[in-house]
Amino acid sequence: MSTTKRSVTTRPSTSSRNVPRGIWELARLHTRESWLCWYPSIWGACVAAGVSDTVLEPLAFARFLFGIWASVTATHCAFCTFKSVPFCFFVVPRYSSDYWHLDKHVQRCKVRPLPSGMISTPEALLAFVCWVPFTFAITWATLGPAVTVSFIPVWVLSVIYPFMKRLMPFPQVVLGAIIGGAVFPGWVGVTGDLDHLDQALPLFFATAAWVVYFDVFYATQDLPDDKKAGVKSLAVWMGPNVKILLAGLGILQIAFFAMTALRADLSLIFWILGIGVWAVSVPWHVLSLNLKDRHSGGSVFKANIKLGLYMTGVSLLELVLLRVHHAPMKVY
């Protein structure tokens, strides 16, 4: 670990109790992390329009995008809160709450709301309980019943995910399925079809590979602490060979994005500005990772937030130029 970087700061004692801010930060609303979750839904909608040859009416599609943003953000808030609550000891009583409270064991995370004392565990649990009906209601109200049904696998896997960091060496695979699964609500919102979601699988696999990829970069920040605490991750499992894994995941992303573009008959806009730029970014990410500097992985993770935003912009550009016209669109 580099000794030249700034050390992790701790919160002053005067700010240790701040429940509203604690709820805000537990939901990760002070970060851009939720962006990584709604990108795939927008990709799903854009690709579905190509596969189904759907013409979209601008205002209806704008309302749909708002629904996707609101629903995915609420889902992210709810389950980030859930992930932070060390309640798992109620389910597995032979372990203490500290065993499941991973933030206490990671230096970078000790300033988060629960370990810093900003909010108590019962208060955090109550916040999660409040997020659940809100998430369901906003999804149903803005996107309708079919899209709400397509969210169910995402919600179920989000309940399972926090346990996986203690129970399996590759929890990022579960996270990949969760965020990759956000492709399907976007797809269903355009097609209204829950029966032919196999058409969305190439995009799902591209997204899932990308999620595992960027989360492995993120996990390299905490390698010393994770090893000491027994936290499981692909970064810990692969150790010094992690760059081989990252390169393989990069190849998978590009291959599945190419398959997606072929099946949806996407234009050169997506091929050149989207896949082309993505293919150049992957080797740059892998070569930029310095395992001796725990801040290196965090920098590449942030670069992937920007890359996902860029791909979302490219997808919307192609959609607007080719498929958004003044014609009726039914949002399901």
UniProtKB/Swiss-Prot annotation:
According to its UniProt entry, the protein is used in biotechnology as follows: Yanuthone D is an antibiotic against C.albicans, methicillin-resistant S.aureus (MRSA), and vancomycin-resistant Enterococcus.
Knockout consequences = Loses the ability to produce yanuthone D. Also leads to the loss of production of yanuthone X1 which does not have 6-methylsalicylic acid (6-MSA) as a precursor.
Q: Does the keyword Magnesium apply?
A: yes
Cofactor(s) of this protein: Mg(2+)
One Gene Ontology term of the molecular function aspect:
transferase activity, transferring alkyl or aryl (other than methyl) groups
One GO cellular component this record assigns the protein to is: plasma membrane
What domain of life?
Eukaryota
Which pathway does this polypeptide act in?
Answer: Secondary metabolite biosynthesis; terpenoid biosynthesis
Query: Do you know which InterPro entries this protein is assigned to?
Result: Prenyltransferase, UbiA_prenyltransferase, UbiA_sf
Q: Tell me the membrane topology, using the record's own terms.
A: Multi-pass membrane protein
Membership in a protein family:
Belongs to the UbiA prenyltransferase family.
Function of the molecule: Polyprenyl transferase; part of the gene cluster that mediates the biosynthesis of yanuthone D, a fungal isoprenoid epoxycyclohexenone that acts as an antibiotic against fungi and bacteria. The first step of the pathway is the synthesis of 6-methylsalicylic acid (6-MSA) by the polyketide synthase yanA. 6-MSA is then converted to m-cresol by the decarboxylase yanB. The cytochrome P450 monooxygenase yanC then catalyzes the oxidation of m-cresol to toluquinol.
What this protein is called in its record is Polyprenyl transferase yanG
